[in-house]
């Protein structure tokens, strides 16, 4: 798998396939064809086969894929065969919504700390999480082996928070602030900019 570049779109689809397979597994379905997966997630079966081919040989011609085996493979490829500890910085509207989202835990992502620098928020509870002072960030990251930091502060403060997260030892940052972050190459940043997504949507609506 190392040595050549796997398209990001393939990785995103792998995550979608994996969730689909998880559903089949829960329903007790044991085999599935690429056509079934394709129909279930809304892509072509050629695309499914091409995506999976990046990661080796799966399935048996004429029989299809063993659901459990393919699910385990996709989870392993996505790094989801173990759980991940995360911290959320910014306990505002978005940070609170992220803390309330159950879906993270179902996929093995555990929030172990929520931080803010607003004294009126520190000590308050968001679901089961008590908002912690930002000064505790490094300690919580270290003690809980946190590898992922989520930035949910206004753009003007995002770089400071990113620098602190990196110094504390996180390996990846999910950044919701609409700004570009400067981090060392070894740290992976994924930015979620909802406005950019909306604008891609409006571009495509107009173009069609
Ligand atoms: N709310 C949304 O739907 C939404 C959607 C997409 C992106 N975003 C982005 O997410 C970020 C947060 O948005 P929001 O609506 O939750 O804002 P918000 O103002 O409700 O919350 C931001 C929180 O960050 C805290 N904060 C500020 N500086 C900090 C620092 N240095 N350390 C720790 N905490 C700090 C504030 O006290 C506040 O509680 C923004 O960058 C915003 O552009 C928000």
From Swiss-Prot:
Assembly and oligomerization:
Homodimer.
Gene3D superfamilies named in the record: NAD(P)-binding Rossmann-like Domain, Winged helix-like DNA-binding domain superfamily/Winged helix DNA-binding domain
What is one term from the GO cellular component aspect held by the record? cytoplasm
Give the record's family classification.
Belongs to the transcriptional regulatory Rex family.
- Key words of the record: Cytoplasm, DNA-binding, NAD, Repressor, Transcription, Transcription regulation
Residue ranges for the DNA-binding region feature of this UniProt entry: 16-55
User: A Gene Ontology molecular-function term?
Assistant: DNA binding
Q: Where in the cell is it found?
A: Cytoplasm
> Under which name does UniProt file this protein?
Redox-sensing transcriptional repressor Rex
Q: Which cysteines are joined by disulfide bonds?
A: none
